[in-house]
Amino acid sequence: MKSYLDLLTDVLENGSVKGDRTGTGTISVFGRQYRHDLSKGFPLLTTKKLHFKSIVNELIWFLSGDTNIKWLNENGVKIWNEWATEEGDLGPVYGKQWTAWPTKDGGTINQIDYVVNALKTNPNSRRILFHGWNVEYLPDEKVSPQENAENGKMALPPCHLLYQFYVVDNKLSAHLFIRSSDSFLGLPYNTASLACLTHMLAQQCDMGVGEIVISLSDVHIYSNHMEQVKTQISREPRKLPELKLLRKPESIYDYKFEDFELVGYDPHPHIAAPVSI
């Protein structure tokens, strides 16, 4: 994906040095966008190997509404461990807001149900979206993620926070807004996850897939990722893999990792980098 490598180059060449919540330090640019036509392959990076199983299982976990890392750990996903309490709780993060947004009368709203129904019944609507930015549950930046979760707040606020969908010629496209993008570690996962979700929704609604568009606000590279980024930029992108969904589950909530087949993934080796907490 040359567009992703171009984005990394943009940050390296034009980024401003900034401090950040983690204390690591970054170089950052503000306001960028890139897109990918899903008919040209599945957007899983080939310039470094990514763990596809973690991407799919995290998305399945989000859609389940779960906010405890126990299921993730049991399914080989460790990417949330640093922020969870000893009991594995993360507070009302992504899945809670997606599937059970609290209402003032004590009920909940399932935004994913709304999206699926709207795609099936009113695909020309400009209101087909969901988001996770529930101000009432945003964390207190003065305390740790674990303390926030223990206090009923999110351990971390959503980075990938608003998803909107668009249908033309019976093909589904998706637009994601990311407020804060760790461009080396986080963005490749977000891109592939968005593509998976688009394929899943399209299948559930008997549509084809169009393109994904990602709008990024604060796009940064952490100071301890600079050499890794330069290594990645030096690599030549290879042909993208294809994604096949092997069955059509009864609902968007019933997918399993075994339903996803990645064909022709031939990436360069993995590039390790530390996570800033």
From Swiss-Prot:
InterPro entries reported for this sequence: Thymidate_synth/dCMP_Mease, Thymidate_synth/dCMP_Mease_dom, Thymidate_synth/dCMP_Mease_sf, Thymidylate_synthase
GO CC terms of this entry: cytosol
Catalytic residue list: 159
Pfam families: Thymidylat_synt
EC identifiers of the protein: 2.1.1.45
Location of the protein in the cell: Cytoplasm
Catalytic class of the enzyme: transferase
Residues that bind (6R)-5,10-methylene-5,6,7,8-tetrahydrofolate: 51, 182, 276
GO molecular function terms attached to this record: thymidylate synthase activity
Residues that coordinate or bind dUMP: 21, 126-127, 179-182, 190, 220-222
Pathway: Pyrimidine metabolism; dTTP biosynthesis
GO biological process, one term: dTTP biosynthetic process
Catalytic activity as recorded in UniProt: dUMP + (6R)-5,10-methylene-5,6,7,8-tetrahydrofolate = 7,8-dihydrofolate + dTMP
Origin: domain of life: Bacteria
Annotated keywords: Cytoplasm, Methyltransferase, Nucleotide biosynthesis, Transferase
Quaternary structure, from the entry: Homodimer.
Family annotation (PANTHER family): THYMIDYLATE SYNTHASE (PTHR11548:SF9), THYMIDYLATE SYNTHASE 1 (PTHR11548)
Family, per entry: Belongs to the thymidylate synthase family. Bacterial-type ThyA subfamily.
Function of the molecule: Catalyzes the reductive methylation of 2'-deoxyuridine-5'-monophosphate (dUMP) to 2'-deoxythymidine-5'-monophosphate (dTMP) while utilizing 5,10-methylenetetrahydrofolate (mTHF) as the methyl donor and reductant in the reaction, yielding dihydrofolate (DHF) as a by-product. This enzymatic reaction provides an intracellular de novo source of dTMP, an essential precursor for DNA biosynthesis.
Listed name of the protein: Thymidylate synthase
